[in-house]
Amino acid sequence: MTAAATFRFLTPMPRLGSGAGPGGDAARWAAELRRIEDLGFHAVAVSEHYSRGWTMDALTAMNFALASTTRLRVMPLVLNNDLHHPAILAKAIATADVLSGGRAAVGIGAGWLADDYRALGADYAAAPVRIDRLTEASQIITTFFTGRPVTFGGRHYRLDGLEALPRPVQDPRPPVLVGGGGPRMLALAGSLADIAGVHARLGPGGFDARAAKGLSRASVNRKISLVAAAASKAGRPAPAIQFTCYDVNVAGVQVTPIRPLFSDFIDAHPASFADSPTSLRGEIGKCVEDLQRWRDELGISYWNLGGNLDAIAPIVARLSAE
């Protein structure tokens, strides 16, 4: 019998506030990162957006978090491939891995939020084109992490003997997460990623009815099966599974602000969400049991339960050693 995967909990990067005086935000932010580390979280998750009030640059925040801690890992969840040249991104992550003693990861997706592209004046190509670019970029990044010179001739990227320096500290490489919700994205994750971020399938505007439907227990099962099938076809072990709970309520504390559309969809289809990992609700003991069951039945080991540390810390304390 295969041993159950170890639980690894992620929490979102703390938001910048309004610290008093020069360095006030930085000091508070560093203290919060160290608190996350001391509570036993595996990693802090960094997202990347350029609209809707998003404050931080992802890579700068990532490096600050690594410099402010000694054990905590940092995992982009996720970077928009269209905003980074893959070779430059791979070099940045490899450098962060070396300087942090092996605590960096790279999480990457095809880009989905049209507002980001509009704000930057960037071309929001059709999804198949964005996924094609991500496929090539992922191949470049994983090759770079081997330390071998990178020569690549694709439709979207071309490299000629690029020196893959520095060589990352982690062996065989910093974890590569590919996140998405559609069949092609899940297949890509299964074929080459170390971690598959299984999520809702988001359209240009974000969370909609299709996304909500795709988070039922049956849909999550199908998504994870697609990842496993792609890994098998590629002749490699299936990647670890990362999942974000959209509705977390621990002992009456609403940890994540549930989206009205999602709430309405759950209320209209209670049977579909009766045992979906999308919604974690109950006292601490019940939440622990649900997470253990979903890990054992679905294989989900990386969990993002939101950023209310006080509410979810007891769960992390109970499960992070398993």
Feature map (PLM): residue ranges:
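Active-site-adjacent structural elements that line small-molecule/cofactor binding pockets in enzymes
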Residues: 1-322
